């Protein structure tokens, strides 16, 4: 069983994937940098959670 992500993280991640799909890969470290570039996220923790969600989504789409 995994952790359930908050709606804000899911919504933000979905919007970023929709707008900037070409910037994201299945690598978390690269996605952290990409999220920092394209989104105005105030805290490191929130940035990492959004990047983790985006990474998981990209991995699912490529599988």
Swiss-Prot record:
This is Small ribosomal subunit protein eS17. GO terms for cellular component: cytosol; ribonucleoprotein complex; ribosome. SUPFAM superfamilies: Rps17e-like (SSF116820). GO terms for biological process: translation. It comes from the Archaea. Transmembrane segments: none annotated. NCBIfam families: PRK01151.1. The gene is rps17e. One of its GO terms (molecular function) is structural constituent of ribosome. Keywords: Ribonucleoprotein, Ribosomal protein. InterPro entries: Ribosomal_eS17 (IPR001210), Ribosomal_eS17_CS (IPR018273), Ribosomal_eS17_sf (IPR036401). Belongs to the eukaryotic ribosomal protein eS17 family.
